[in-house]
Amino acid sequence: MIKSQKEYLERIAYLNTLSHHYYNLDDPIVSDAVYDELYQELKAYEEKNPSHIQANSPTQKVGATATNPFNKNPHLMRMWSLDDVFNQSELQAWLQRILKAYPSASFVCSPKLDGVSLNLLYHHGKLISATTRGNGLEGELVSANAKHIANIPHAIAYKGEIEIRGEVIISKKDFDALNKERLNANEPLFANPRNAASGSLRQLDSEITKKRKLQFIPWGVGKHSLNFLSFKECLDFIVSLGFSAIQYLSLNKNHQEIEENYHTLIREREGFFALLDGMVIVVNELNIQKELGYTQKSPKFACAYKFPALEKHTKIIGVINQVGRSGAITPVALLEPVEIAGAMINRATLHNYSEIEKKNIMLNDRVVVIRSGDVIPKIIKPLESYRDGSQHKIERPKVCPICSYELLCEEIFTYCQNLNCPARLKESLIHFASKDALNIQGLGDKVIEQLFEEKLIVNALDLYALKLEDLMRLDKFKIKKAQNLLDAIQKSKNPPLWRLINALGIEHIGKGASKTLAKYGLNVLEKSEAEFLEMEGFGVEMARSLVNFYASNQEFIRSLFELLNPRNSDMAEEKQKSSSVFNNKTIVLTGTLSKPRQEYAQMLENLGAKISSSVSAKTNFLIVGENAGSKLALAQKHGVSVLNEEELLKRLKELD
């Protein structure tokens, strides 16, 4: 229970961290049930204290902000999140609010699949783009990969503009086969089918996506110009276009019918082809939907009725510590194997050491294990009556299990702060090279992985010592590609200070905080906790994280700063951006250009532009090369400004 505004602000920061791990890193720290409980407490506090509500509260936004390496793409109509209900009384209260005003309302119920939400845009019957949910307003453009999902039609009979939305999932059977393949290849296993679906959809190599046997199950539409009267009619229309039908779909008139269908799904969930975590309930009549409208985050005409967790008893026989992508240490219990919902469970997350202490969980305890939402196994509580004296306290580690570095222990999480820790080094370098950091073109995760395998790099400093002959050893590297990467690495020297600070990947310090820190000069990271706390927007966790990070990596940071020679200010860059005709404009590139489109896209983004893959009424400029195709006609229809490559180069030159 949240008791003060300070606790409220801490809860927002904590939930946003969890959301980032879940949506962007595919690396959930806690189970769905724990997140839901924390979220509901936050929501209850805000209902009692509406004047305290913050814009960055998870109740005010959907999902998480999209991250690299995929381009951002806006949805034509927002993708909303659903409010959850957890029991009969909550469902009854939700239904009564609707039926009191609209007694004739009916409800469409369907299984809630636990996958990755995807928005497909069709125009003139062709698949134009596929975009993940992201923050609800824009997501990641994954069109090339989505086209390898067998049951996504590349063409449909309807010729108007329409967004078709659904869930990308992997079946239980295919998930088990995939993990078996990875086990045989000594590759890390996917924690659950949702992670497998997300990771497969976001592959840089579309051939990998093609092999993963993903499926797309539609559940609704976004923008369209059709005149449906009911939600059921809309779903039937989607199926008529060649999409897969939703199993166990039902139309219900009252609470009793909904409960009957809910319990039918619970009985059938074990034999269902994919993992489920509840039932979606949507008002069928579209005129009633329109009148009910939306909250800041969710539609008032739909909800997700969550399933109860599946639980069994077993024994903790050991504990290991895993190092996540951000350096977070997650204790994992080794269990006597127990079957839950058809899966043999021999491990379960303990989340963090604060959770272990709070629940008084001990080694050799008999415990209650649940699979919350059919995904991450979790230990809910110890069965203290079974204790026989053989139990021992689970000690919080003091050093990293991988690199033996001293750990940073916060109130809830424990982190490895060592940038050279092998468990987090690869992800740190991917972040180091990313668009919001040093923006090194061509240095993606596959290249970094090869560099590690060939023992050519250990940390970011090694990137700047690479030679042409080093890169020529890598798969698919020829002289031109190798030289381009070397040039891009050298070009990243002398960056704006905020970019280098952000590239370090310091816990709790993102792009905005890095820009604030850069205002204090090149020696800013040497400041004390008290000095950091005086900076606008900096709290205790951020200040401590900075101090501990610098203390652990002083030598590395000094060497990196000396080598890269960051600029104390990028005022010229900001001035150029603000005076640019492209600043805050949405731009689409099409056709064959003399340079790669990505190169032009990067130039325009540096000038404040937003790059999109599809033309709409919101597009400001269309940049056309040879064989521009249908996008040119669409731009002319919407009155979009069209520039050829020569005109674009002229405008770019004027800004130099």
UniProtKB/Swiss-Prot annotation:
Swiss-Prot/TrEMBL keywords: DNA damage, DNA repair, DNA replication, Ligase, Magnesium, Manganese, Metal-binding, NAD, Zinc
Domain BRCT, chain residue ranges per copy: 577-656
Positions annotated to bind Zn(2+): 400, 403, 416, 421
Gene3D superfamilies with a match to the protein in the record: 5' to 3' exonuclease, C-terminal subdomain (1.10.150.20), BRCT domain (3.40.50.10190), DNA ligase/mRNA capping enzyme (3.30.470.30), Helix hairpin bin (1.10.287.610), Nucleic acid-binding proteins (2.40.50.140)
One example of a Gene Ontology biological process annotation: DNA replication
Annotated signal sequence range: none
InterPro entries per the UniProt record, alphabetical: BRCT_dom, BRCT_dom_sf, DNA_ligase, DNA_ligase_AS, DNA_ligase_CS, DNAligase_adenylation, DNAligase_N, Hlx-hairpin-Hlx_DNA-bd_motif
Documented EC number(s): 6.5.1.2
Catalytic-site annotation from UniProt: 112 (n6-amp-lysine intermediate)
GO molecular function, one term: metal ion binding
GO cellular component, one term: cytosol
Annotated CDD domains: BRCT_DNA_ligase_like, LIGANc
Listed cofactors: Mg(2+); Mn(2+)
Residues bound to NAD(+): 32-36, 81-82, 133, 167, 306
PROSITE patterns according to UniProt: BRCT (PS50172), DNA_LIGASE_N1 (PS01055), DNA_LIGASE_N2 (PS01056)
Transmembrane stretches, start-end: none
Reactions catalysed according to its record: NAD(+) + (deoxyribonucleotide)n-3'-hydroxyl + 5'-phospho-(deoxyribonucleotide)m = (deoxyribonucleotide)n+m + AMP + beta-nicotinamide D-nucleotide
Physiological role: DNA ligase that catalyzes the formation of phosphodiester linkages between 5'-phosphoryl and 3'-hydroxyl groups in double-stranded DNA using NAD as a coenzyme and as the energy source for the reaction. It is essential for DNA replication and repair of damaged DNA.
NCBIfam families linked to this entry: dnlj, PRK07956.1
Similarity remark: Belongs to the NAD-dependent DNA ligase family. LigA subfamily.
Protein name per Swiss-Prot or TrEMBL: DNA ligase
